[in-house]
């Protein structure tokens, strides 16, 4: 499990669990809802705050699209940690739109 923080300028900081990551974005779980379209800064261990936008959030799961891609080495490091953490809730997908 990789714990992180999503900081929103309106609401402050909320703890999250990172469950999926790519160069373009990440999936997470949280106890608190996030508004789609909200601007956030992602804080992860050893990573400078990374800006992005909430692109979906439902039932405690959500996704962030980064403003700029993460370096492939950073993605590989966090992806390996997620894989090592086990199958918990990895590879979240946004709900289908009706």
State where each predicted segment sits.
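Structured alpha-helical
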Residues: 1-98
